[in-house]
Amino acid sequence: MSDILFFSFVSDEAIKRERLKAKELRKSRWWQEKCASGICHYCGKKVGKENLTMDHVVPLVRGGTSTKNNLVPVCKECNNKKKYLLPMEWEEYLKNI
């Protein structure tokens, strides 16, 4: 995973705007309900809602947005491993570990 290189054509300003949107969504009832089960979207582990983070399925640096259909609750371990990977790259990574 660490040897994957890509160039981001998303501006720093656009990423900053999307991060602000994500921050607002974290405060929403919608997000609280998404996290209520305490289960990671990727690995399925029950880690508790306080240990879930917000992940952009399509990362911001890859053109993703902070919209409800692109945000999932994940454990910190999965979020740290996934980083900037697209869904199919993440699935490939999981197959190879």
Predicted regions and their residues:
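Short, charged surface segments at domain edges that flank catalytic/cofactor-binding sites
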Residues: 2-42
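Short beta-strand-alpha-helix junction that forms the catalytic/metal-binding core
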Residues: 63-81
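Histidine-centered catalytic micro-motifs used for acid/base chemistry in nuclease
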Residues: 53-59
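Short, cysteine/histidine-rich loop/knuckle motifs that typically chelate Zn2+
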Residues: 42-43, 77
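Cys/His-enriched microdomains
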Residues: 38, 52, 73
